[in-house]
Regions:
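Terminal targeting signals and extreme-terminal segments of soluble enzymes
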Residues: 1-83, 89-163
């Protein structure tokens, strides 16, 4: 799957259109549950390209710590591309959380994905602090409440794995 028509429609939301393939649909004629996670990942990659690389900044290395998916309604084969809105909803010391809404051809939200991503030092595979430049980019696509809490919020990566 490749991205197309990547746009940042406002200061708080990054919007991307991702084409869906025939093979993304299951035998029940619905977008397969794994395909939702794949298109969300592609949208996060487009987010990184558009928000970091386009500004001449390196794309931060991140590991996904947690993904939470809520399915509301099926996406049917009459949808040839999904629209995904990505917003940063929490920023900690070493991690940040994105909230993504996946919409069908009618603009109806069919699924949401919350993803905790941890900034890592690739040489050690260890968490590292989010840099000042990364924080600057992340707060540009963050909920306004997140911007005020960015330097004082508890780090989602430091919570127990049971949450």
């Amino acid at each position: 799957m490749s991205t197309e028509d990547n746009t940042n429609t406002s200061a708080q939301v990054h919007t991307t259109r991702i084409p869906v393939r025939w093979s993304d649909f299951d035998r029940f004629n619905h977008l397969n549950n794994v395909s939702y996670i794949e298109v969300a990942q592609e949208a996060r990659t487009a987010f990184a390209q558009d928000e970091f690389a386009a500004r001449g900044l390196p794309i931060p290395a991140v590991f996904v710590r947690r993904t939470e998916v809520d399915y509301f309604r099926p996406i049917l084969p009459d949808t040839t591309a999904v629209e995904i809105d990505t917003t940063v909803v929490q920023i900690g010391t070493t991690s940040f959380t994105t909230h993504q809404s996946i919409k069908d051809r009618n603009g109806t939200v069919c699924c949401t994905v919350d993803c905790v991503q941890i900034a890592v030092d690739l040489a050690t595979s260890s968490p590292r602090a989010i840099t000042k430049h990364e924080l600057g980019v992340l707060t540009q696509v963050a909920d306004s409440a997140v911007i005020n809490e960015a330097t004082s919020a508890d780090d989602p990566a430091e919570t127990s794995a049971d949450d």
